[in-house]
Amino acid sequence: MIILITNDDGFGSEGIKLLKEVARNFASEIWIVAPDTDRSGAARSLDYPVKQSIGIKQHSEREFSVSGTPADCVIIALNKVMNKKPDLILSGVNIGSNVGDDICYSGTIGAVMEGAARSIPSIALSQVYHDKIDWHNTKVFAPKVIAKLVKVGWPKNIVMSVNFPAKEKVKGVEFAEQGEYNIDGDLTFTENSNGSFSLNWSREHSGSGSINKIKEGFITITPVKLDFTDYDTLNTMKNSCADEFSSIAD
């Protein structure tokens, strides 16, 4: 199996080094193409349409850093760096959870969405932490979770988001929705001496879905789809609102 690894925390992060070790369990060939700096929060954004150039630095035969976003890295890996299409894309291991609205902001998720858009099975992995990051649960359980996911498979337009709890005792695996944060949580601004501001965002969760299960000590697996369309609302609007809008172009 050929595996492409990327992330949003940067080429030198501990998480990507760990993911390389995890991938050794089932990969015949491992490629790493990751941002040269921390690009957390980049989502599925692209630098290449607006930058005149993007740098690619080769560190070893199959390891590269890129002066772009996680999604840029996947595109560059598939179209420039790799000589074969990977069988699987792994993104992470992210420092911190990817649940609730984080899924929309996450470069870890954005990278695998870029892979799924090209019909490549793609998994994002994240390690929850509180005060200090502890990779133990990822080290122990990631190889098993990845192997099981590859075995059962999933639709091409879906990515898998896996979160490992910070709790020492893992209770098991739960398939769960992403959950919700109170996005209007406390956002504080602290002015720095140079006139810039430091931001701190404290958000409360709804107590549902993946967020709650992680707190209880479960590994969570959340299928995330590329297509954001709400088909129930779309069909309702087609049936009940079409007449209201029919005269706009007259």
From Swiss-Prot:
Lineage summary: Bacteria, Pseudomonadati, Pseudomonadota, Alphaproteobacteria, Rickettsiales
GO CC term (a single one): cytoplasm
E.C. numbers: 3.1.3.5
Family: Belongs to the SurE nucleotidase family.
Coiled coil: none
Known function: Nucleotidase that shows phosphatase activity on nucleoside 5'-monophosphates.
Database matches in Pfam families: SurE
Root EC class: hydrolase
Subcellular location: Cytoplasm
Substrates-to-products reaction catalysed: a ribonucleoside 5'-phosphate + H2O = a ribonucleoside + phosphate
GO molecular function: 3'-nucleotidase activity; 5'-nucleotidase activity; exopolyphosphatase activity; metal ion binding; nucleotide binding
UniProt superkingdom: Bacteria
Gene for this chain: surE
Matches recorded under HAMAP family: SurE (MF_00060)
The keyword Hydrolase belongs to this UniProt entry's keyword annotation: yes
Name by which UniProt lists this protein: 5'-nucleotidase SurE
Residue numbers binding a divalent metal cation: 8-9, 40, 94
Keywords: Cytoplasm, Hydrolase, Metal-binding, Nucleotide-binding
UniProt key word Hydrolase: yes
Required cofactor names: a divalent metal cation
Main location: cytoplasm
Cofactor binding mode and count: Binds 1 divalent metal cation per subunit.
